Amino acid sequence: MTESYALFVAFVLGIVEGLTEFLPVSSTGHMIIVGHLLGFEGPKAATFEVVIQMGSILAVVAVFWRRLFGLIGIHFGQKPPQDHATLSLVHIILGMLPAVIIGLGIHSWIKANLFGPETVMYALVAGGILLIIAEKFRPTVRSETLDDISYKQAFGIGLFQCLALWPGFSRSGATISGGMLMGISRQAAAEFSFILAVPMMVAASGLDLYKSRDLLSMADFPMFAVGFITAFVVAMIAIKTFLALIRRLDFIPFAIYRFIVAFAVYLVFVA
């Protein structure tokens, strides 16, 4: 791979990562397809994906930095009253706990058995079905904003997040759907999903980077930098656009799109 082509690949995959990481469409499925079409696969590609994923994480931090600082008691501007319930670090810990416990136990097994195109294809379909169920059967909204989310709801979202251990299911799709099925508004569920992503993805990406540290070299720095910066910028735009859209649109189009991507995976890799 020439240096110019490597930078082109980094730019394209950075766009794909930034667009799909926080939408309920599965970034894994898209990265598998686009990586295959670009001829960029294997251990180095997997390490590159982890690095540019960190760019997407940084975008969430940039969008929700006030909320993230608030979780650790640092407030900018007017501090909320003491008797006013707000999103806290406890909510995030409860949301993380199930996936952390299960993920640590089966991380190696997932890497060895669930990263194939066929299993990702099934996950795309299953995640699409869950989105439809969440839209069609969600109960009356009891938690309209982030600060209305209860500890029980946060833990329930954490249980749904375990579904995203199945590559292709979509972490945001699982957590947003779970939140909606527990009476959280679409907007609040999406915002909680994004904030919850920061510690979860930092932990998962950090573990993957540590395990693949031997594959990192200064020669790859330009490619990794282009992918990282592109993913950061595109993810910033995608997050803000997505949060604006879901105020007036439901998730059915995303479910249909997932089925289309699953069919594309079938045609390219399975048929």
UniProtKB/Swiss-Prot annotation:
InterPro entries: UppP. GO terms for biological process: cell wall organization; peptidoglycan biosynthetic process; regulation of cell shape; response to antibiotic. PANTHER family: UNDECAPRENYL-DIPHOSPHATASE. The chain crosses the membrane at residues 5-25, 45-65, 86-106, 114-134, 149-169, 189-209, 226-246, 251-271. The lineage of its organism: Bacteria, Pseudomonadati, Pseudomonadota, Gammaproteobacteria, Aeromonadales. Catalyzes the dephosphorylation of undecaprenyl diphosphate (UPP). Confers resistance to bacitracin. It is a multi-pass membrane protein. Pfam families: BacA. Its EC number is 3.6.1.27. It is found in: Cell inner membrane. Bacitracin is thought to be involved in the inhibition of peptidoglycan synthesis by sequestering undecaprenyl diphosphate, thereby reducing the pool of lipid carrier available. Belongs to the UppP family. It comes from the Bacteria. This is Undecaprenyl-diphosphatase. Keywords: Antibiotic resistance, Cell inner membrane, Cell membrane, Cell shape, Cell wall biogenesis/degradation, Hydrolase, Membrane, Peptidoglycan synthesis, Transmembrane, Transmembrane helix.
